Design a protein with these regions (language model features):
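Glycan-recognition and catalytic regions of carbohydrate-active enzymes
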Residues: 670-671, 728, 732-745, 757-824
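Conserved alpha/beta catalytic core and glycan-binding cleft of carbohydrate-active enzymes
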Residues: 349, 354-356, 360, 585-586, ...
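Carbohydrate-binding surface patches
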Residues: 270-284, 797-838
Length: 916
């Protein structure tokens, strides 16, 4: 047969014939295809969408009518959720299942079943917390996909309250290990008792009820509870559990009821009587216990009266000077004894408070209204010092070794006849001596004659001086008087005094006087009720709680007023909150705006919200508070986390930007050169060495073991010069200037005196570096260009120069900050060879700092616009062109202008009179 068709019709016919052949072949094969039912097997497909807030490891527990139970893991996933695919031999009419964990927590209370099968396949969709079994995706997705929280249901377990805590004065949060029926009516069978007396439950609510059951609820009572009594909760099937103090301590109702604004906490002494007041709002009874001797075991009890806002008071008639005392508190029927947190002095080892006459502890020469002159915060040059380190060396020339009184000794000299002690520090030129912890701390036995050592970052009694630094720790007045003598002596020598404070933690919350007086209030706790240790050194103080914050502020103000202190360094300040720090700044500024506040602004990962932490990131929210700049520290010498890590001065390239960030005082200088946002340069504390980690000299020994001491000395000088010429506040560890070593010990907090002492012989051995240091200090003090007060001033006057790799150079122009030098160039060369940099102009330049000498006197001059910077050296030059405005001191320049103006006025006046 012949057919004649068109081209398009031929193509259509071909497709049709192919389709017919394919369908025919499939039809021929159909009899050979078997369903799962025909194959003798049953396939189960379970799709499971867990609750969004559940991180439990769910699996399937399946059983047939033959009771062959077994666990099956989810072995796939799709858009709906997890998928479990299982094959069973034989045909099934019904399959039981539970969605559960290996600990037998179930997502619903009921056993459920798959009862619909299609050709040997049973496919269902399940939603966590929902008892319904869905046989289609459309049905399961209806009504949205928001899932309720899953109450963990346990099989064969005894009911118990796993959480019972007081969140408000009349509200208890509970959580149970197994679900209980919830009707949303009445008290749900829950019984609350206070010291055995049943309280009225107003209502019980829950946001996590599923099919009439829950494990979480909130109990609201008809009245506020007495926090000093034992509160319990129980329910049929759930044994009685004591309620702990939860968020109630942070609640507005608690603060309103118990915040005490008064200034008389602690003891108030007079010869006629001493008044005592302690804050213990959760106590049902409080007693004052007095002791005649520091080590008496039994004292005299006096019942205190309940005062306002959770305080307790008692007046003890007569002169109670040098009487020791504690408080006993009864909380939930248990008596506990504690030292007064506000005690101004304590017994030996700080186990009892002491009543002292503060006026009687003033030295014969005591000028609390007078301090060394100091106006601008960035005029500070801070010298960190440990009381014992200062004088304990046999070569120190000081008699009161390891004591406060060592700071009062004059004319001390070492074995080589060289100046030591306060005379030496004064001559060095620093402005502030920062004393490492001088409050009463644990871990040193004040009654032992054996040599003991600790840095002191484990506070015991915040408002009392450390007894091991006094000549008589048994007399509570002596430690106070001798510390005042030390402060006065330093002031008399033109040195201000800063105090290192540790309000972020105490060694142990359980042993602290805070927790004994008000359990659960002064420390931070995690969700399980465990006191947090966010520093790694002890339990964290909850400064965000009003009375804890009040204590810190009161304590700082007490030290500032009573001891006439000039600054405070806050250990691990990032654990404190912004509100606490800004309140301290406000209060101190009202007393004396020149008082320094600085702190470690590291983010320690606290329970505080990020924006609330007193960290570097939030520096712009804390004006007037300075933070340690670890960027320039690590940039100069290498990371402190790796002892062998190098930095700019000791051989690591591409660290220039870190150095530049420090040079500008951490301000927001440019897109690349910035640190903590829009801050003032006064907020950057620049340093390369402190008591933590290796000394700079020890670090250089570790990072550059093959270099000789001459090379390492150059590196050391280079590092010191970067710090002292940078904008901001320079900070040094005592002895850094004479290459202090701790023998490679990077954490000498409890090492012996041999490791920690200031070895005064090093001063003589390294007198060249000491003099170099002094010269840099003199340069900084006499030239305000290195101490600009604002970010805007720095951006206007400080420009970085184009430099080779491993070189940082910059120019300060325009008589910046009213400096007498019009143009200053500073350069740091970390290379092993000399480099040349191009200057902005050609003129006569005076060199005042090089790799060997430093100061304000001209070492030599050169002309031109090229500067050769020696290897591993710093250089500072200024425009020395003959110009009256740049060669004369600024005050003479000012006088000349005034004289000129006066002459002009007189001339014009005389001319006017002659014309008349």
């Amino acid at each position: 047969m012949n057919f004649k068709i068109g081209k398009n019709k031929s193509k259509t016919l071909s497709i049709f014939l192919v389709a017919v052949l394919v369908i025919t072949e499939l039809l021929l094969l159909m009899p050979n295809v078997k369903t799962f039912a025909q194959s003798g097997k049953t396939k189960i497909i379970i799709h499971y969408a867990k609750t969004p807030n559940s991180d439990l490891k769910w699996n399937m527990w399946l059983w047939t009518d033959k009771n062959d139970e077994s666990k099956f893991e989810f072995n796939g996933k799709d858009e709906f959720g997890k998928v479990c695919v299982v094959e069973f031999d034989g045909a099934l009419n019904k399959l039981g299942f539970i969605v559960r964990t290996d600990e037998w927590r179930k997502d619903t209370v009921d056993d459920r079943f798959i009862e619909k099968f299609n050709n040997g396949v049973g496919e269902v969709w399940l939603k966590g917390g929902d008892t319904k079994v869905y046989y289609s995706l459309a049905e399961a997705s209806a009504g949205g996909s928001k899932l309720a929280a899953v109450p963990p249901i346990a099989i064969g377990k005894t009911g118990e309250f796993i959480v019972a805590k007081l969140d408000e004065m009349n509200s208890i949060s509970i959580e149970t290990n197994i679900a209980f029926p919830f009707t949303a009516k009445g008290n749900e069978g829950i019984i609350v008792k206070s010291d055995g007396q049943i309280l009225t439950v107003k209502k019980v609510t829950s946001d996590e009820v599923i099919t009439g059951i829950t494990t979480v609820a909130k109990i609201e009572l008809s009245e506020n509870m007495n926090l000093g009594k034992k509160i319990t909760v129980s329910k049929l099937g759930f044994p009685e559990k004591e309620v702990v103090l939860g968020d109630v301590m942070k609640s507005a109702s608690f603060e309103k009821m118990f915040y005490y604004e008064g200034t008389d906490l602690g003891n108030t002494y007079s010869k006629g009587k001493t008044s005592f007041r302690v804050w213990a709002p959760t106590a049902t009874e409080v007693k004052l216990v007095t002791y005649k001797k520091w080590n008496d075991k039994i004292g005299v009890d006096s019942s205190m009266k309940k005062g306002e806002k959770g305080t307790w008071t008692f007046d003890l008639n007569g002169d109670q000077k040098d009487v020791f005392y504690t408080y006993k508190v009864n909380i939930k029927g248990v008596w506990t004894e504690a030292v007064d947190p506000y005690a101004r002095s304590v017994s030996a080892n700080g186990d009892k408070g002491a009543v002292i006459d503060l006026k009687g502890t003033d030295p014969e020469i005591w000028n609390p209204g007078e301090k060394p002159n100091f106006t601008n915060l960035n005029d500070a040059i801070i010298y960190e010092l440990h009381v014992r380190d200062f004088s304990i060396d046999k070569n120190s020339g000081m008699e009161n070794k390891g004591k406060f009184l060592a700071f009062t000794e004059k004319g001390t000299k070492g074995t080589e006849g060289k100046r030591t002690g306060v005379d030496y520090i004064k001559d060095l030129g620093v402005t502030h001596v920062e004393l490492m912890p001088i409050f009463d701390y644990a871990s040193v036995d004040e009654t032992s004659s054996k040599a003991q050592y600790n840095w002191g970052y484990n506070p015991k009694n915040y408002n009392a001086p450390e007894g091991s630094y006094s000549t008589d720790p048994y007399n509570p007045s002596v430690r106070v008087k001798e510390l005042k003598q030390a402060v006065q002596s330093l002031h008399d020598n033109g040195l201000r005094v800063n105090m290192d404070v540790v309000y972020n933690h105490m060694y142990s919350s359980n042993d602290s006087n805070f927790n004994k007086l008000v359990p659960g209030y002064y420390f931070r706790y995690d969700k399980d009720g465990t006191a947090t240790n966010e520093s790694g050194f002890g339990n964290t103080i909850a400064c965000e709680n009003a009375m804890a914050r009040k204590f810190i502020v009161d304590s700082v103000m007490y030290w500032a007023k009573e001891y006439n202190l000039d600054g405070f360094r806050f250990d691990l300040m990032g654990l404190l909150d912004i509100n606490t720090m800004t309140e301290i700044r406000k209060k101190l500024s009202s007393l004396d705006p020149s008082i320094l506040i600085m702190g470690e602004g590291l983010d320690m990962g606290t329970t505080l919200l990020s924006d609330a932490k007193a960290t570097q990131k939030n520096a712009s929210k804390m004006p007037g508070i300075s933070l340690f700049n670890d960027i320039i520290r690590d940039g100069i010498k290498g990371s402190v986390l790796d002892a062998k890590a190098k930095g700019f001065v000791n051989g690591k390239s591409y660290e220039e930007t870190k150095i530049e960030k420090g040079i500008v005082g951490g301000i927001d200088y440019s897109n690349d050169i910035k640190t903590w946002g829009k801050i003032s340069p006064l907020q950057s504390v620049n340093y390369v060495e402190t008591h933590d980690n290796n000394t700079l000299w020890d670090k250089l020994l570790l990072t550059n073991p093959k270099d000789d001491n001459e090379i390492r000395l150059k590196m050391h000088k280079l590092a010191d010069s970067i710090i002292l010429t940078s904008q901001g506040i320079p900070f040094f560890q005592a002895g850094q200037e004479f290459l202090r070593t701790k023998g490679g010990n990077s954490n000498s907090y409890k090492s012996n005196d041999a490791v920690n002492k200031l070895d005064w012989t090093l001063k003589s051995k390294n007198i060249d570096t000491v003099n170099y240091f002094k010269g840099l200090i003199k340069l900084r003090k006499e030239h305000p260009a290195f101490k600009m007060n604002s970010a805007e001033m720095i951006k206007q006057n400080l420009k970085f120069l184009k430099s080779p790799q491993n070189v940082v150079a910059y120019e300060i122009s325009h008589n910046a900050n009213m400096d007498t030098w019009s143009d200053i160039v500073v350069a740091f060369n970390a290379n092993r060879e000399d480099v040349t940099i191009k200057l902005s102009k050609s003129c006569t330049w005076n060199i005042v700092v090089d790799g060997e000498k430093s100061g304000v006197k001209t070492i030599k001059q050169f002309k031109g616009d090229s500067l050769v910077v020696p290897a591993l050296s710093s250089i500072v030059i200024y425009d020395g062109s003959e110009n009256i405005f740049t060669t004369l001191p600024f005050w003479i320049y000012t006088v000349l202008i005034l004289c000129g103006v006066t002459y002009l006025i007189l001339f014009l006046k005389g001319r006017k009179e002659s014309l008349e």
